[in-house]
Structures are given as C-alpha cells and as structure tokens.
C-alpha cells in the first residue's frame, strides 16, 4: 500500500528511508504523518487519522520539489471478492466487508496480481476465494510547479454485509466529512478556514459532533 510517483515519464525506486514527522496516540484517536523526501522530484506525506474502533482516514500528499508532468498512483492491496464503483472499493471476506472510499476524484481500476514463484502463495488463506491479490490503483496525471501538490484522500472502514455504514464527502483537497449513524467527523491536514466551522493550521486535525 503506497504511492508511486513518476515525473516527465521517468520513475526511480522510492528512497529507502522515511521520517516520522508527527504522531499522537489518544484515548479515542490516533494520528501519524510519515514523510518520504526527494521521491522522483517530489515529497510524499502519508497522513493517517484513526478513530479507534471505527475508521481510518488517509491523506496522501505529493508536493512537487521540481516542476514537471507528474503521474501518480495510490495502490491498495487486498484479498477476497471485490467490487468497484466510481468512488468505492469493497472487499468481501466471508461476510466481513471492508471499504475504501475516495473523495479526490482519482480514476480507479482494480488489477489482479499473482503472488509467489510458481505457487499460489495465498491459496491457504481462508478468506480469499482464489488466492489472488486485488490491487486498487487510484490514478492522477497532472502538471505541477515547485511547491504545488496533489492529494489522494480515502476513508477506510469495515462493516458487516455489503452496505457501508459510513459515507465520505469532499470538503476541500485536504479535508473530508465522514457521516454515519453514530455521528459526524471532519478530518483533514494542514491549513483550512471554514467560516463558522473551523480555522486551523494544524498538521493533522480531527473534530466530531460527539466524542
């Protein structure tokens, strides 16, 4: 599960090391930001916001260090029966479902991938019907000047049955509204000004209408 970055048609391996920029482990939430620097002309920040026992929100920010035409892919790997709508990727593992819902408008496709050398590596996994890895590929291609950025924003959560129990809506490139029967949450990264609602420049932030 990662972001692939290429610039002007060239792609090199990601840097071998990443830095933990921020972390917090609170009673009801967890927050983390990891930075991969100088990755094919850009910096990649993975921001993870965790509402414990409920969901994860992941913002992947790619900020250009150098101007160029960027080709970006955010990859998510899973096992089981999958379905794909324009905004949601759902995995069924024997009645236990998992969804990834994007709010950034990236084009999405699912590819099947065989793992192992000459054998089905995941054939014995009890919650995979065929042993194939299903890879969700979220794709964006765009020109970026130095300092500009592109963001992949995704809500990840589990649910019993095919119908997701949460809904994600785009508020801004760096902010998402999550709604469910148990409440609403506003999650984001970096500076935002929502008149009458929220103004902050925190690296990662999360507010709710309950706890």
Give residue spans per PLM region.
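CBM-like, beta-strand-rich accessory domains located in the C-terminal region of large
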Residues: 1-211
């Amino acid at each position: 599960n990662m972001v692939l970055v290429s610039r002007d048609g060239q792609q090199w391996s990601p840097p071998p090391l990443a830095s933990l920029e921020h972390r917090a482990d609170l009673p009801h939430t967890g927050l983390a930001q990891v930075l991969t620097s100088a990755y094919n002309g850009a910096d990649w920040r993975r921001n993870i916001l965790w509402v414990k026992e409920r969901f994860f929100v992941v913002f992947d920010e790619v900020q250009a260090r150098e101007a160029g035409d960027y080709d970006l892919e955010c990859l998510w790997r899973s096992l089981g029966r999958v379905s794909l709508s324009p905004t949601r990727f759902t995995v069924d593992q024997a009645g236990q479902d998992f969804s990834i819902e994007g709010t950034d408008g990236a084009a999405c496709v699912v590819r099947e991938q065989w793992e192992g050398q000459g054998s089905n590596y995941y054939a014995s996994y009890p919650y995979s019907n065929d042993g194939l890895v299903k890879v969700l590929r979220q794709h964006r291609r765009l020109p970026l000047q130095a300092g500009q950025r592109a963001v992949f924003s995704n809500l990840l959560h589990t649910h019993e049955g095919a119908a997701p129990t949460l809904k994600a809506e785009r508020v801004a490139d760096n902010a998402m509204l999550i709604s469910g029967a148990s409440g609403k949450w506003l999650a984001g990264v970096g500076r935002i000004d929502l008149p009458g609602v929220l103004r902050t420049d925190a690296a990662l932030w999360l507010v709710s209408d309950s706890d």
